[in-house]
Amino acid sequence: LNFEWLKKIASSDCVLREKMTLFWANVFVCRDNHILHIIQFNNTLRNHALGDFGAFVKAVSRTPSMLKYLNNNRNVKFKPNENFARELLELFTLGLGNYSEQDIKEAARAFTGWNFKPNGDFILRTNKHDENPKTFLGISGNLGGDDVIDIILKQRQCAEFICKKIYTYFV
C-alpha cells in the first residue's frame, strides 16, 4: 500500500493530503486482510487527513479495521479489553508516561460495546457497554468512548505529542 500511496502522491492534485494520509497511516497503524475494511480505513484517513484532529480520532476509532486490529470489537462490559485504550493513549495521542494504568482500565470500560455491522458501519452495542461511572484523567462521570477522546484532546500533552510527530515527519 505504501508504494500505491507514493504513486498517488506523485500524481495527486492535493499532494499534502496524500502525504498526510500516509503519515496518519504510519501513526494509526493497523492491519486487516478484509479488503473492503482496509479501503474504508484508508479512505477515513484520507477524508480526515487535513481536518479536525478530534473528528479524525473518533472516525478512525470506529473503523472495522481498527476495531478488529486492537480487539475493541471484543471489548464488553463484563470483560473489558484494554488493547485499544492502551494504544490510543500510548501510540496515538499522549505518549508513554502521561496516563496511569487505572486510566487505561477506565478508558477500556468507556469503549465497551464499540463494534461494527456486517456492512462496516459502526454500532454501539448498548447491551455490551459499561454504563457505570468512570474516572479518566481526573474527570468522572458516565463516560463513553467519545468522552474519553474529548478528555484526551483537552490535554496539552496531546497537542505536543502530535505536533512532535508531524514535525519529525516533515523535517
Model-derived segments and spans:
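Active-site substrate-binding loop specific to GH73 endo-beta-N-acetylglucosaminidase modules
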Residues: 5, 38-171
